[in-house]
Amino acid sequence: MAGNRARIAVDAMGGDHAPNEIVAGAIRASEELDVDILLVGDRPSIEASLQHHHPSPNIEIVDAEGAIEMHEGISELRRKPKASINVSMDLVKKNRADAVVSAGHSGAAMGAATLRLGRLKGIDRPAIGTVFPTLLAGKSVIILDVGANVDCRPKYLEQFALMGTIYSQYVMGVEQPKVGLLNIGEESSKGNDLALATYQLLENNKTIPFIGNAEGRDVLSGRFDVIVCDGFVGNVLLKFAEAVGEIVLQIMREELPQGWRGILGTAILKPNLKKLKQRIDHAEHGGALLLGVAGVCIISHGSSYGPSIFNAIRLAKEAIDHQVLDRIKASQENPTPDSVQASVEK
């Protein structure tokens, strides 16, 4: 493997379609992206999957014993120290890998990252950030937390807003991100105790470009670049958005005329349908970034196929290339917008 390329540890045993689809996505990433891949898991199973692809010099297998199954609790992390997700996190901890991608048990991925990598200084709770498309073509919004913390304190949401701002600015390329707090109304007086207290924190924090509350109708409007909420609300929002995307695609398929008219119509609309799918299909986004731990971790959907794993690896590479971890660290050490960039670029 090359020395200066990004090294991504991929949990080959995690997900509904492991290891075949995980390997397929990893192989494609090794060929199309400037990355080296460490496939972590059961060697015979991984080797059997690799036989369906052309050999790649950028692929290495790292042995692990078993996985944390979807029906198991995160307590299994301690009982299975050599499970694929634990070994993957250890590779980052030992500087053998720069990031982890897993489509396995999301709770286990979060637990392993927190236990083995630890939290970044100044971050009380890691958050899962997911990128959503908006009504404005080419513009997305990152929403966090979408599942790591079902109960939150105001200061947690304040930290989420800071991490989301950094991600939006440096990875998504938004020069001046606009941050919103998900709430039941635009007015600062609206919401429960958590929302009211968080609003005051965000409004008084001059390092966060907070512009006010975001109602449900604003989430995909393109008005906001970052939206923060607790993990309970965020996870419901995530699952609902995924379902709506699938329903829209299914309705479009059903409503296309049958027979030769349908064939002709599909041919004409194919480029537009492809663009629509790219905008609303969760597989196109690859996964969610676990922000706040001392390592780049991407949590993919459990039902991920090869294309989604490829996009998850691409997402991990973008986080590495844009020094997301270093920028979050700098924001805690020097809490001003300008010092974040200066500290990283020294």
UniProtKB/Swiss-Prot annotation:
Main location per the UniProt record: cytoplasm
Subunit and interaction comment: Homodimer. Probably interacts with PlsY.
Catalytic activity: a fatty acyl-[ACP] + phosphate = an acyl phosphate + holo-[ACP]
EC number of this enzyme: 2.3.1.274
Protein name: Phosphate acyltransferase
Localization: Cytoplasm
NCBIfam families tied to this protein: plsX
Gene3D superfamilies, per database record: Isopropylmalate Dehydrogenase (3.40.718.10)
InterPro entries referenced in this protein's UniProt entry, alphabetically: FA_synthesis, Phospholipid_synth_PlsX-like
Biological process terms in GO annotation: fatty acid biosynthetic process; phospholipid biosynthetic process
The keyword Ligase is annotated on this UniProt entry: no
Pfam families: FA_synthesis
Keyword Lipid metabolism: yes
PANTHER family (alphabetical): FATTY ACID/PHOSPHOLIPID SYNTHESIS PROTEIN PLSX, PHOSPHATE ACYLTRANSFERASE
Function of the molecule: Catalyzes the reversible formation of acyl-phosphate (acyl-PO(4)) from acyl-[acyl-carrier-protein] (acyl-ACP). This enzyme utilizes acyl-ACP as fatty acyl donor, but not acyl-CoA.
Pathway(s) this gene product operates in, as recorded in its UniProt entry: Lipid metabolism; phospholipid metabolism
Alphabetical keyword list: Cytoplasm, Lipid biosynthesis, Lipid metabolism, Phospholipid biosynthesis, Phospholipid metabolism, Transferase
Origin: domain of life: Bacteria
